[in-house]
């Protein structure tokens, strides 16, 4: 059984969950079944991953009367996509995720990004010239609509993803239901010490996405460093007789950060949760933290004039302009 962390709502959130971003249709159902069968009790989803229906098929096979798990045995997160930030769209978007996942409530529902895109059902709405269509809905207004989901029992808790410290404080200044989580990219090359500390000081739990550095990210370029191949990580892993992935996952949970590694390979899914039978020394914890180079892998980029640039940097709510 996995360890849990207690959220500000009192809910218990398992410290290791299965990430489902980039899990292709045809693979994600089996991945979720494999995860549930080897002890995972936390599944991280999002409408934008375009695979919640398959996740729902897996959940239906394992949850309910006469099956191996009850609904309250598992913790399911989903996320509101950028095109659904308008307050009139939030409830419908949540209900669509619930319908696809075949659930009556979510344990946690996050605003996926602080940036609103043009309304509609296209994941990335574009102008005729190919640039992305942004919308001026403010995330504060989106938050007010998110709070109604808690009041209606559609989500037990609500939270944020990819928000910077100023944006978190902005939400806290108006929140009736406080955000309980900020889910952000985090790994030994992007330790996020200041942001993690900021979240904790405001009673938010941090969840790390791409906790292993996302070696299969869509915009990886040849020659970019792969965290799992870092000789220093490999060396530490050997000394514990563990895999590099297990050592990094252990580092996250030992520092108090929830992590959601993605895999569709049953053997690796199982390995990724076998991290509760060893402990990293304080020295190794500090050593891994020292690998930080503030290197962000998960920012959609485009090529302009031969240079790779951040796609959404001109959005007024783009979060990564701030130091943290």
From Swiss-Prot:
* Annotated NADP(+) binding sites: 10-21, 44, 161-162, 210, 212, 214, 262-265, 268, 271-272
| InterPro entries according to UniProt | AKR, AKR1A, Aldo/ket_reductase_CS, NADP_OxRdtase_dom, NADP_OxRdtase_dom_sf
What this protein catalyses is:
a primary alcohol + NADP(+) = an aldehyde + NADPH + H(+); S-nitroso-CoA + NADPH + H(+) = sulfinamide-CoA + NADP(+); S-nitrosoglutathione + NADPH + H(+) = S-(hydroxysulfenamide)glutathione + NADP(+)
- Any Pfam family matching the protein: Aldo_ket_red
Task: Write down the EC number.
Answer: 1.1.1.2, 1.6.-.-
Q: Mind telling me which residues the site (Lowers pKa of active site Tyr) is annotated on?
A: 79
Q: Name one GO cellular component term.
A: cytosol
Q: What is this protein called?
A: Aldo-keto reductase family 1 member A1-A
Q: Which organism is it from?
A: Danio rerio
